[in-house]
Each structure stands twice: as C-alpha cells, then as structure tokens.
C-alpha cells in the first residue's frame, strides 16, 4: 500500500549487475530548490523529480546518477500511470504534458481551468490512451462541482468535455482486477453528479455511461431503486465501492459492485459507517477491508473484512490506531499472502473516557487478520512495537517490499511503542515471525535485489554515513559508506519492485555561506556482488514452519518462494522480475481456515473459540413459524474469504438450532394491528421522530428498520420507542425537562435536565447508546434557545446558559454562550460571549463562502442587561468581534441569505439581507404601496424563486386582513398578487403552499372588506392558484356530498357556491398540512360548500387528487389526517370528539374502510407518522380519562402491501407507477403546461397492490418546455391587476425609465415599458412573450450591434447573485430548517414570557416566526419574516409536523398556547423546484435553516 498523502509522491529506481568492487558507487547531484515528486517508472532506471519553487522537471535515465531538465515544461505536479510504466502526466495550471516513452518526449494539451486538487486524473487500467482529467471545482456556491474531460487517444486531439457538474468520475476499469479478462464495459465511466434538478449534496446521483455521457444510466442498488445522496466512490481491487449519505445524517450506506451491473448494500452488523470516519484499506483480491472509527474524538477504529462479494463485513481487529488524516496502522506484508502488521490501542477505555495518551502495541497476523500475536525479538523476552503508517518517515511501504519475507521497522521493545527518535531499526527475514536488532537509532531503510542488499540511513539528524547489509540485515553484518559531507535524509528509495542494486537518497546539506542545499545521492552496489548460483538459493522457503519443520498452511495453502540464502553474498540479478511464489493446497482445518459468519460474534480464543449469534442475528426466512421447535441454520462459521484449502469440515454444514434460543418473528397477519400504551400525566409535552438514514435499502436486519420516537410527558419522564410506538421504555432514568433533537443529524438527540447534566444519544437511542455530558452552566431561564447546532460539523454545539442564576432574583444572573467542538464531551466547552439573546452558526452548504467557525450573536450593548441589542460576528470564537448592526430586533440565517431586522429611530422596522455574511443591503419595497400601508408585513414564502409578502391593510383586532405581494426572481421588486387576504391577531395568514408541487397555493380572502372596515365580522372565501400567484380562482365545489346528495347552491357559479376550507389561522394544531411532499397532488382539508366559509363545527372533510382542480367530500364532520407509504394509505381520525376508530383508504380516497383500534371511545388529539411519510405505521396521541395514551396503528400486514412496488426510471409506466402531470384549470390549450413546461411525477397506480417502501424521487422528468402564453406572465412592477384581469398602472405612479438598464455595461439593448413580466418559475420558450411586447431599442454605443443582432437582453441572474444589494429583498425562503434560532426567540407559537422549560417551548418549531418590532406604543406589530412550505413537510412528524407555514423573527407575545404537542419530527420536507438553474436568490430545493 503506497502511503502518499503528505509525503512526496515518490517512486523509484532500477538496474543491477554482478561483480566485486570494494565499495558502492556514490554520485551526488545538487539542486537549487527543494524537491518533490521523486518517482521511478516501474521496471526501468528512468526517474523524474520536480523543483517545488519553480515547477521545473528533471529526468534521469540511469537511476538517479545523472539528471537533465526537461525543457519548456513547468508543472504543478507529476502523476504517473499506475498501469503503464511508460506513461506519465505533468499537470500545469492550464497547459499540461503527457509522455508515452518514460519522459523522453512530451506532448502538450490545454484545459480552460487548472486541474482539480482532489484527484485530477482518472486512469483506465487496460487502455493507456483512455484518460479522464478533472478541472478544479467551483466551490463558490458549494457543494463543489467541476468539469471532467476525457481523451481516447492520449490527448493527441483536444480533450472533450465529459460532464460539467460532477463531484467525481472514474472509469469502470479503474483497477487491474476489476472485470479482469472480461470483454465488456471498456468505455464505461461512472460519475457522481449533481441531482436532476438540484445541486444539493443530498441529491447527488451516481450515473454511468458507455458513450461518454451522451446517454446515461442511473444504476439500481440492491433495493431495486436508484439511490440519491452519493458522496464518494473508489475502486478497490476487483470491487467498486460507492457511499451514499442521507440528508440530516452523517451515516453512510456503502454499496459494492463487482461488475457495475449489480450492486449490493454492504452490511456491518451493529456498527454504522459515518462520513469521514472510515478508511478502505489495502484489500485482498477476494475481500474488502475497512477500518471504521469507533469514536468521533478518539482516533481508533475497528477493522472489518468482507466476504467474497463485498456484502457482509465481520470485525477482525478492535481498537486499531488511526490518525486525523484517516490513515490506519495497518500493512500487509508485500508479496506474501495473509501476513498483516497492525498497531492497536491498549488503553482504549481510558482514552475514550478521559482522553489519555494512547498506548500502542504492535501485533502480527499470519491469517489475514483473523488472529494476531505479539512481535518477538530473538533472545529477548519483551515485546517489539513498531512505528507504522500513521507516523511515516519514508515513501512507499512501511515495513516490507516484494523481497520475500524481508521486513524492517523502527521501534522499541517494552510494554508500549515509544517515540520515534527513541526507536531502533529492527529486521526480520521470516516475514515478521521473529525479529532482531539491526541498527541502533532510527533509520530510513530500503530493500534491493530481492533482499540481497538492505540500505539504511540515520533519520534523527545530519549524518555522513550510509549503512548497508548483504546478509538480510542481521546484526553485525552492516557496513558503512562514508560521505564527504553530512546529509539530512528526507527520502531513501529504489525501484518499486526492489529488484535493483541502485538506490537514491534525497536530502539536504549545509551550504558554504549558510543555508542548505538539496541533493540527490545515487548509490550503486552492482559491482560489489557476484551473480548467485543454484546452491545459493533455498528453493522452498516458506512463510513459517510448523512444529515438524514443514511449511505451515496460510490461507489454505503452503506458500513457497525461491529465495537467496541469508549468508550467500551474491546478487540475485533478476532485474525487474518480481519473485513468484508456488502454492500447495492444504486440507481444510476447522480452526485455522474458518472465521465467524455474519451476525455471529466470536467468544474465546484458539481452539476454545466459539461463534455465538449476535444481537442483530435474524432467523432465516420461514424459520420457527407456527409450532416449529427448531430450524436449520448456519453453523456460525464460514470459510475465510480467499482461503484455498481443499475438502470440507463440519463447519461447512448447517446445524440444527432451537427456536427457543431465537426471538420468534411476530405472527404474520393480513390485518391492521394496534397497540395501546398508557402513560401517567396530563399532557404530552414533546414528541420527536428520529428518522433513520433513508439511503439504506431497507433490507438490513440490524440497523435501519427502526422507527424511533422520543416523547416527554408533563411528569418530566422521557420515553423512547424504536418500533413506532409498539413498545415504549424510559429513555433515561432521570427527570427530563426538554428534548432537543439535532437539527442536522437525525441520529442525535439530547435530553436536558434542570441541572447541568445532559443525556444524549448519537445512535437514535439504539444499543444502549445514551450517555451524558456536563454543560458549562445551567440552561438559561429567559425563554431563549439553549442549544444550536452546526449544519456540517455535527459535534459543534452552542449552549446558551444562565450564569449566576442558581438563586431566583439574582441581579447578576445573565446569559452566556459557550461552544463545544466535541459534542459537549471531555470538558470541551469554551466561553463565547456574555449577555446574549441568541447565537448561531453562519455556515451553510450552498451559496455562502464563510469559515465554518463563523458565528453571529445578538448581544446587549456594552454587556448591559437592558441595553439594546447589537449583531456581532466572529470567526475565531470571539477572540475578535465585529459589530454588524445596532438596535437589532432579530436575525435569522437561511441557506443563501442572512436577514437582520433592526429598529430605526422613528420606531419603524428595517430589513437588511446579505449573501455572504459580510456585506448587507437594505430591502427596498414599492414606494407608493408602503405610503398607504404602514402597519405590519409577513414574509410568507420564497420557495419558488419569488418572495410572497403579506402586507397588513387593516390591523384592528379581529378585523385583520391585508394584501399579498410577490417579488421578481431577485426579490427586489414587488407586484400585487392577491388582495384582502385573511390574517389573525398574531400576524399569521391564511396562505399555504402545496407540498411536492411547484406553484400551487391556497389562501382565504375577505369578501366584505368595506363592512369589515366598519367593524363587521369577516366573511371569508377560499382561493387557489396554479401559477404561483399570478392568477387566483375560487375552489371548485364537488357536485355531490359524501351521501351522494347535491348541494343546495349552484356549483357552476364558483363565487357564490364554491368550496371554502379552513386555513392556518384556525387550526387547533398548526402543524397540520393540507398536503404531503411524497403524496404528489393529494390534499385533504376541512370546510364547506356555499357562498362563504362557515364555522369549524359545521365543516366536513374534503380531498383532492389533482392538486386542487377537483374536490370531493370524503366524510361528514372534521377529521385529522395523515399520509403513509408516500400516499399509498391515508388514515383519518375524528377531530374534537371521543372515538374508537379510524378510517383508511388504500386507493387515494376512492373508498374508505373503518378500523376499530379500541374497545371504548377515547379523545384523540393528533395523528402522526415519520416525517418522510414513508411508513405504514401511525401513532394516535390522546387522553383517556386521566391517562395519556399513544396508539400504534400498523398497516404493513395488509395484503395490499406485501410486495414492493417496481419502478423503472427508464420505462416508468411499465411497472406499478404512472406518470402524472399537474394541470392549470383555466388553461384550455395545453393545460398540462405549468410554468412553461410539462412536469412528470411518479404516482402509484391506483389499483396495484404494493408498497412504495424506500422513498422514491417523485419528480421523474421535465418532459418538455412549452410555448409562452398569458399564463406564464404576471403584472410587471408598478402595475396591478384590475377587475377585468388586465394589468394597469398603479394609480399615482409614473413609469420608470426603461433605459436605466443600460447602466449595466453588458446590456446592449432594452425594451419599452410593458405591463407584464415573466413568472420566475416559468421556463417557457417562444410563443407570445408578453414581457417583450414593447419596442426594443439599442443602448447608447451599441447601435451597430443592435442592427446586426436583435437578441434578447436584460437582467441576468448571474448579476443578481454576485451583487450583494440584489439579495436585499430576498427576505425569504423561511423554513424551520432555515432559521438559526431553531430553538427559540424566533417564536414559533409560544406565549411571550415564561421560563425556558415552559410547556410551550420556543423550539416547538411552527413554521411561522413573528418579528415583534415594538413598532407602536402598547401594541407590538409583527414583522413576520419567515415561512415556507418547503419545510413544512419536514413537519414535525408526519404532515402534522410541519405547520402551516411561516417562520418568524420572533418578538414578544405573538403566538398561541397550544396544549397539544403531537408529532414533532425532525425531518423537513422538500419543495420540488424543477428549474435546473438553482442559482436564484431565493433558495434552492431546500434550505438548511434552523429555528
């Protein structure tokens, strides 16, 4: 294994001879600058080296004896082909060179950008002319994506573009053993690229192509589905491994293939694989070896080895030593099968608990890591310990070379490994079985001529000696070479195959006049040794011998080498010829050749070793069903992968096992099941879903199947369930006052006590994973957020506590913010700033290039408790701070924007926005509009590349209403969308976006505005838009009710007889949503048919399956609802009265069946399921008499869900799915054209019986773009819609000068003012372009260009992104995930005041946040700046988790006292933005925000 990182990318030298000179030849070549990239072309004496400072390249044709500069070439680096010893690349900034003759000749080619630093070249293992070249990635809008080029002629012609937006690419045949000898997939390339319609890392896809990405295929994994969130891939011997990461989880799913056609999900039993916490090691030809970190803060791991197809991994070595770079002290002895050297941490318990320094021990295995033994020194009792990969001091392998059985290392004897400089050089010539001291002090070392000569140079300082041995390095056989100067050796190297007698030392020596000079010393032993004869060889040297002196069996065979005898002073002289072993098979031995099978754990040692079923053991299919008392299963053993022993033993055979020793499977049922659990208490305070990593294929029998919920009652008892509420247990045995799920890491949850003690789990509470840490101070008692989390560094936590607050009323009590970079563990807290209201991490994945350490805080001026707030910033944990704003009311960060609300001297509120956390600009709004309406405004949504802003027109109590205005695509100009929209006293608005579909929204308007202005009661009607607010229409009432009776009004007249539904302002539980992001086109609502909306008590329940075009009444009365299995099942339960049953539908609401879950009626407050709506389990939450209860409803047993649905993206209607396209109800021509394109979504066929299972990507494709029509346009800035639907100038306004766009030097022409502008979401092309109906004119200076070319001009989105002021009014994209203050002070529905442990905690994440500006005396008028529906789905547990739709910058006292705390979840939903250009200012498919 070549350990190159951080070292000099070396390689090495050649040539040999035989003669008998007294001393070796020594030649010294000086260089002017420091050298890097010293490397050999394999099997030759040709070497290259590079000067670091100037990039000059030098070539030697005689193994480093002489060097010549390669003319006209200056590079950044040299990369040699690992598969062809004549090919290398020199990479420059934009000009590059390639050689096919070991550097004698170089041909140049160019790229537009410099090469990627992440791995610039992809080599084809079988065709040296096929090369991939990766350009540097664009990280400006993170995550980093770049362009890849390809050549099939070795860059004789210019390289061609492969893909523009890849994370990484490689050839399928990127390693020699992959598809070796198989004549297929020669041109196949695999790339991890951006998602179909998103460049967020959670949407990254793995694509394959056989024709250079003219056509692509997305491979299906073992689940039969494609997998998004691809993070990495690597070629390992005969395997390709790809890693996928689910959103809000650092846990990875590894997929393995041996042909790229079929992929398997790699299973690690009880252990999880996490991002940046695993290393794929130098694997064998028949298995993959992976070292997995066991702790985030302690660099230790466990070594796992796979079975032969790379699917099942078993643990071989525990507590392996690692370093921060991911390197592991693990090396296979070269050329000898089965011998492995590792270093393990002996005091692992102390290291994990208290952070003690690691005490390392070295161990060796002769059976590929299945068993280990100590390293012993001849004639000594003590153990030997050697420095390994984590402490590299030379290039190439650490211990060995292809020289058979010759191993060297620097270390010491004793209990543990000491410092490198306290070590000595040891040697073994029996592959590490026994060792002896070679030289005192630490030395660099190298092997030559198949071990005939060993060379060493002092490595603790300058030296004028070089040591060598012709007798296997045994003590007292080392000779000296005396130099005329002292050298500090930096690298000692020879040919990679160690067959040469020539060596090179690169180092530095003192220069006359001061300073140091860099030199390469060439050593040649060729003339010192005669050629060996037959008598000088041991023809059957073996790795180790048994007690009888016969070669012992390793991996099922005896491995025999022809090796020079240790005391024969002669040269093997087989230059460039690697030693080849002979193999003799052995009979299988049940102890030696077997290991524990998957899901079996080893106990005992040696012949007492047993393999017991592990906790995650599962019965074979069909076992122990009915009355069966036993079953046949694995013996617990398997033959070690790659073991070539002959015959069988008893361990190959299945054994009879008793069913009583195994957990019986739950009896299968074809019915719905329910389980009721009762709890003491009066109220459920909190419930959260800890949803599993959804990248798992769902077939795991250990991790991944759980559906974990944590819950807290008002008795301060926290409970946890891993099976969606069938079995509950106490989470911790202590009083808990709050639960904090980690906002960005689904596996992490925190249980807060009233003291400094915090319990936590980083594994969803599984496997006894709940631990505790001590917070620096008690939680604050000011209703401020206590914990904040970092979106990327999952263990970085901000803690907002109270100092001097132990006694009530202490005047010195104040808040202090602390930060931990170790998840609160190991006393890792550092103080940030005191007297703060809120702190938040600023870094986000997309669009903000700031340091990960950057933090914003609101701090009281001069650290005075009652002083106004300042917004301060720091990127060094407040060693220095920068004051951004004075008089701050609130701030929030979103994926692209940071929004700050400040109070001006006249008590008005101002908003400022920033893209980069450095430059802020004030949000500007239409002047005349705000001359009329100066009360309050609410940012409703910005998920469709435009901000929806509600401006209050009438602020009088119980008379509130206002207008919704909508921005253009950069958020800087607003037009009227809908007037007289209902608002409540708290500032929340009846407006809701439909989940999973673009541009569909529902709002309630006031139809008796004049009367309301005089104090009358509001009369409300519902409106719906299908083109993002450009047109609004009444909801079409169904023809008949659920009793098949007609309504008593004329439904043809929608304004007098429409469907009206209750909105956000009236919900008892505001987390309920009309829709689900995974049940595309489906909505449920409660309301009535008639001229206006009546009371809640008079309402019935309605449903639509076509995104609100048509509706039907499904039940009389008001019901709560939840979607399961992505809409396969819909469950509804009576709201507001006692009940003992639910109704459910498995055909999208066509038919409803009753299921009775209890033998008496109970009051149900809420129904919830997992945030992604992918489960077939639900929970009912409620109260029965004086007890709380939770009811699990499990629909998975129904016959309808016994098979998994089949989805083929290449032929989507062939299986169990249809393609469905939403339509516009008012569009006669091409009604399926919405926003200028036909979008196609997967929807399960109504009559098929199958379960969706793993979450599918709802959006299939954009089938085509459409011609532009009137529906693709809305009124332009300064225009508004009149009663006829036409766009007219706002009264009192004059038209702006259209020629102002010419101030942009890139604009060559402009259009006269028009009344229309294109809807930001629309992608229409051609047709009638209403925004260009004005005359076109040239800009000054471009008249000639104008005559030649009448191309369209105008504002480009790119400018909107790079000019900070353009973000000014991009106030939105508020999702609960999009707030920094996720847990508080951005008040999401709690009363003002109370303690941090109040039952209406501030981190109860309603997706609305009201900014109280204290604008008027005696009344706080809200600036509700926040919302969005993309979250709402993230919804705290099912659709009920998401809330009606706003996030707000939280001030005083807007909110409601909700008694129900049902269905908090931690996911968040997704709003599907289909415009492939994700660069707009208002957020991409989903933002990472916290509230």
From Swiss-Prot:
The chain crosses the membrane at residues 1355-1375, 1406-1426. One of its GO terms (biological process) is protein targeting to vacuole. It is a multi-pass membrane protein. BNR repeats lie at residues 97-107, 364-374, 426-436, 719-730, 1102-1112, 1143-1153. Residues 1-21 form the signal peptide. Its main location: Golgi. Residues 22-1354, 1427-1491 are lumenal. Residues 640-667, 1018-1047, 1464-1491 are annotated as: Disordered. Glycans are attached at residues 285, 309, 970, 1265. Residues 1475-1491 have a biased composition (Acidic residues). It comes from the Eukaryota. InterPro entries: Sortilin_C (IPR031777), Sortilin_N (IPR031778), VPS10 (IPR006581), VPS10-sortilin (IPR050310), WD40/YVTN_repeat-like_dom_sf (IPR015943). Residues 647-667, 1038-1047 have a biased composition (Basic and acidic residues). One of its GO terms (cellular component) is Golgi apparatus. Keywords: Glycoprotein, Golgi apparatus, Membrane, Protein transport, Receptor, Repeat, Signal, Transmembrane, Transmembrane helix, Transport. Residues 1376-1405 are cytoplasmic. It is found in: Golgi apparatus, trans-Golgi network membrane; Prevacuolar compartment membrane. Functions as a sorting receptor in the Golgi compartment required for the intracellular sorting and delivery of soluble vacuolar proteins, like carboxypeptidase Y (CPY) and proteinase A. Executes multiple rounds of sorting by cycling between the late Golgi and a prevacuolar endosome-like compartment. Belongs to the VPS10-related sortilin family. This is Vacuolar protein sorting/targeting protein 10. The lineage of its organism: Eukaryota, Fungi, Dikarya, Ascomycota, Pezizomycotina. The gene is vps10.
């Amino acid at each position: 294994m070549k350990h190159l990182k951080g070292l000099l990318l070396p390689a090495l030298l050649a040539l040999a001879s035989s003669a008998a000179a007294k001393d070796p030849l020594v030649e010294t070549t000086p260089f002017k600058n420091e050298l890097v990239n010293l490397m050999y072309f394999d099997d030759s004496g040709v070497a290259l080296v590079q000067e670091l400072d100037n990039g000059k390249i030098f070539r030697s044709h005689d193994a480093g004896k002489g060097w010549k500069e390669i003319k006209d070439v200056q590079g950044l680096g040299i990369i040699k082909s690992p598969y062809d010893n004549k090919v290398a690349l020199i990479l420059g900034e934009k000009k590059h060179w390639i050689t096919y003759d070991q550097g004698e000749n170089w041909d140049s080619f160019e790229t537009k950008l410099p090469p990627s630093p992440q791995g610039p070249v992809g080599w084809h293992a079988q065709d040296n002319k096929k090369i991939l070249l990766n350009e540097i990635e664009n990280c400006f809008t993170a995550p980093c994506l770049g362009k890849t080029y390809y050549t099939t002629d070795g860059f004789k012609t210019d390289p061609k573009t492969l893909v523009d937006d890849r994370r990484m690419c490689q050839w399928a045949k990127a390693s020699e053993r992959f598809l070796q000898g198989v004549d297929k997939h020669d041109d196949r390339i695999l790339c991890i690229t951006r998602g179909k319609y998103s460049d967020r890392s959670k949407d990254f896809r793995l694509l394959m192509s056989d024709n250079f990405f003219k056509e692509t295929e997305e491979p299906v994994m073992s689940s039969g589905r494609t997998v998004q969130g691809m993070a990495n891939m690597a070629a390992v011997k005969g395997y390709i491994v790809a890693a996928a990461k689910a959103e809000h989880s650092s846990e990875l799913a590894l997929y393995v293939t041996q042909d790229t056609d079929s992929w398997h999900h790699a299973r690690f039993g009880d252990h999880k694989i996490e991002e940046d916490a695993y290393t794929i090691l130098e694997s064998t030809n028949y298995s993959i070896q992976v070292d997995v970190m066991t702790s985030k803060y302690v660099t230790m791991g466990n070594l796992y080895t796979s079975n032969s197809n790379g699917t099942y991994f078993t643990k071989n070595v525990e507590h392996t030593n690692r370093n921060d770079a991911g390197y592991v002290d693990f090396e296979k002895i070269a050329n000898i099968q089965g011998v492995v050297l590792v270093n393990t941490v002996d005091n692992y318990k102390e290291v994990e608990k208290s952070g003690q320094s690691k005490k390392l021990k070295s161990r060796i295995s002769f059976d590929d890591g299945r068993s280990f033994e100590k390293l012993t020194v001849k004639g000594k009792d003590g153990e030997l310990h050697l420095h390994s990969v984590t402490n590299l001091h030379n290039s190439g392998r650490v211990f060995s070379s292809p020289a058979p059985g010759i191993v060297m290392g620097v270390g010491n004897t004793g209990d543990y490994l000491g410092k490198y400089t306290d070590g000595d050089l040891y040697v073994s010539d029996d592959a590490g079985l026994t060792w002896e001291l070679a030289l005192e002090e630490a030395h660099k070392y190298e092997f030559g001529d198949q071990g005939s000569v060993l060379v060493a140079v002092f490595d603790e300082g300058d030296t004028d000696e070089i040591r060598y041995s012709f007798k296997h390095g045994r003590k007292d056989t080392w000779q000296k070479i005396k130099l005329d100067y002292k050298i500090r050796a930096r690298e000692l190297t020879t040919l990679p195959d160690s067959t040469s007698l020539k060596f090179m030392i690169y180092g530095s020596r003192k220069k006359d006049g001061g300073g140091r000079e860099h030199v390469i010393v060439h050593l040649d032993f060729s003339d010192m040794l005669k050629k060996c004869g037959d008598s000088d060889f041991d023809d059957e040297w073996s790795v180790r011998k048994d007690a009888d002196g016969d070669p012992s069996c390793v991996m099922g065979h005896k491995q025999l080498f022809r090796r020079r005898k240790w005391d024969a002073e002669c040269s093997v002289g087989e230059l460039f010829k690697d030693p080849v072993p002979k193999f003799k098979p052995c009979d299988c031995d049940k102890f030696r050749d077997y290991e524990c099978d998957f899901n079996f754990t080893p106990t005992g040692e040696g012949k007492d070793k047993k393999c017991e079923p592990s906790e995650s053991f599962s019965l074979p299919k069909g076992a122990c069903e009915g009355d069966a008392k036993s079953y046949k299963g694995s013996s617990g053993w398997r033959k070690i992968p790659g073991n070539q022993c002959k015959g069988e033993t008893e361990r190959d055979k299945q054994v009879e096992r008793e069913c009583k020793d195994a957990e019986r499977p739950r009896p299968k049922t074809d019915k719905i099941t329910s389980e009721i659990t009762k709890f003491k208490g009066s109220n459920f305070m909190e419930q959260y879903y800890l949803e599993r990593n959804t990248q798992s294929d769902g077939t795991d029998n250990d991790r991944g199947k759980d559906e974990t919920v944590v819950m807290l009652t008002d008795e301060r008892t926290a409970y946890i369930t891993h099976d969606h509420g069938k079995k509950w247990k106490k989470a911790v045995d202590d009083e808990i006052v709050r639960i904090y799920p980690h906002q960005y890491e689904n596996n992490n949850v925190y249980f807060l006590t009233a003291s400094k003690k915090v319990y936590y789990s980083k594994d969803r509470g599984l496997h006894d994973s709940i631990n505790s840490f001590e917070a620096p101070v008690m939680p604050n008692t000011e209703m401020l957020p206590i914990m904040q989390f970092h979106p990327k560094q999952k263990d970085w936590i901000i803690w907002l506590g109270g100092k001097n607050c132990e006694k009530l009323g202490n005047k010195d009590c104040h808040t202090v913010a602390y930060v931990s970079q170790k998840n609160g563990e190991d006393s890792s807290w550092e103080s940030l700033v005191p007297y703060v209201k809120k702190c938040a991490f600023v870094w986000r994945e997309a669009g903000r290039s700031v340091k990960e350490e950057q933090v914003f805080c609101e701090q009281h001026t001069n650290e005075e408790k009652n002083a106004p707030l300042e917004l301060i910033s720091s990127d060094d944990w407040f060693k220095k701070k920068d004051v951004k704003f004075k008089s701050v009311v609130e701030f929030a960060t979103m994926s692209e924007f940071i929004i700050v609300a400040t109070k001006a001297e006249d008590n008005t509120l101002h908003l400022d926005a920033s893209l980069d956390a450095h430059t802020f600009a004030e949000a500007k709004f239409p002047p005349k509009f705000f001359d009329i309406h100066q009360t309050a405004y609410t940012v409703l949504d910005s998920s469709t590349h435009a901000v929806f802003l509600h401006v209050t027109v009438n602020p009088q109590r119980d008379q509130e209403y206002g207008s919704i205005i909508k921005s253009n695509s950069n958020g800087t100009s607003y037009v009227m969308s809908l007037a007289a929209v209902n608002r409540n006293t708290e500032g929340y608005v009846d407006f809701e976006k439909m989940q999973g579909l673009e541009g569909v929204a529902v709002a309630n308007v006031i139809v008796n505005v004049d009367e309301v202005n005089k104090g009358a009661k509001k009369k409300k009607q519902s409106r719906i838009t299908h083109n993002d607010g450009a047109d609004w229409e009444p909801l079409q009432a169904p023809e008949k009710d659920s009793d098949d009776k007609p309504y008593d009004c004329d439904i043809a007249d929608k304004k007098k007889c429409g469907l009206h539904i209750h909105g956000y302002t009236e919900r008892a539980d505001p987390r309920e949503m009309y829709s689900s992001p995974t049940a595309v086109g489906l909505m449920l609502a409660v309301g009535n048919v008639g001229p206006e909306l009546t009371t809640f008590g008079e309402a019935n329940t309605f449903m639509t399956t076509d995104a609100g075009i048509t509706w039907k009444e499904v039940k009389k009365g008001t019901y709560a609802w939840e979607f399961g299995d992505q809409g396969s099942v819909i469950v509804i339960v009576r709201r507001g009265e006692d009940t003992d049953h639910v109704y459910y539908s498995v055909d999208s609401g066509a038919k409803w069946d009753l299921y009775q879950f209890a033998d008496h009626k109970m009051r149900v407050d809420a129904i919830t399921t997992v945030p992604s709506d992918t489960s077939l389990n639900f929970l009912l939450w409620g109260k029965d008499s004086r007890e709380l209860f939770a009811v699990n409803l499990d629909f998975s047993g129904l016959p309808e869900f016994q098979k998994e649905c089949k989805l083929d993206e290449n032929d989507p209607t062939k299986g169990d799915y249809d393609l469905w396209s939403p339509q516009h109800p008012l569009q006669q021509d091409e009604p399926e054209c919405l926003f200028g394109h036909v979008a196609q979504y997967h929807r399960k066929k109504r009559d098929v019986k199958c379960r969706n299972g793993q979450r599918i990507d709802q959006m299939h494709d954009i089938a085509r773009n459409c011609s532009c029509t009137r529906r693709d346009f809305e009124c332009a800035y300064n225009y508004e819609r009149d009663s006829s639907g036409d766009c007219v100038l706002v009264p009192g306004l004059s038209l702006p000068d259209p020629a102002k766009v010419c101030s942009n030097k890139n604009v060559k022409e402009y259009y006269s003012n028009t009344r229309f502008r294109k809807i930001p979401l629309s992608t229409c092309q051609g047709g009638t372009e209403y925004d260009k109906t004005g005359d076109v004119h040239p800009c000054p200076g471009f008249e000639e260009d104008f005559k030649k070319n009448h191309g369209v001009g105008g504002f480009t989105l790119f400018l909107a992104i790079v000019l900070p002021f353009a973000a000014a009014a991009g106030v939105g994209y508020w999702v609960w995930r999009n707030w920094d203050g996720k847990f508080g002070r951005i008040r999401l529905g709690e009363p003002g005041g109370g303690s941090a442990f109040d039952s209406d905690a501030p981190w109860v994440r309603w997706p609305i946040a009201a900014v109280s500006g204290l604008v008027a005396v005696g009344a706080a008028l809200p600036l509700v700046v926040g919302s969005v529906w993309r979250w709402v789905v993230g919804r705290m547990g099912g659709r009920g988790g998401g809330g009606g739709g706003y996030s707000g910058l939280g001030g005083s006292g807007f909110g409601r006292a909700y008694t129900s705390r049902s269905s908090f979840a931690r996911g968040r939903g997704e709003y599907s933005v289909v415009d492939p250009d994700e660069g707009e200012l208002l957020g991409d498919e989903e933002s990472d925000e916290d509230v």
